């Protein structure tokens, strides 16, 4: 990957956060180690500039749900397409959500903060209720 591409700059920022690169063929293995996990799927920031905002938004969003031991995986452009195909995702950026090792759903695109909180709550609250 060339160091001068917008995606490479984004990739380096995500790696600096300690997030784990994952491929489609290694995703299931990663999920056994990270039952409360999110997988960030990207597209070319030149075509979809909001891809660069997604890691910031998701990082903040996860702090709003501290009952989970969140771990974050990131997929490069090629693997984002492969993983997206597996989960029926065709709009990027996308964030796959897993709790207790189970797929809960996907957050597609960028949303206003209050809407994003509500979307996330809809994905994780049923799990919280079962834990009570």
Please report, for each region that a protein language model flagged, where it lies by residue.
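A short, hydrophobic/aromatic-rich structural module that often spans a beta strand
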Residues: 6-17, 22, 83-103
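N-terminal leader/targeting and pre-domain segments
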Residues: 1-35, 125-132
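Charged, surface-exposed interaction regions in soluble eukaryotic proteins
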Residues: 70-86, 90-92, 108-111
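Short amphipathic alpha-helical segment that frequently serves as the phosphate-/nucleotide-binding helix
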Residues: 52-58
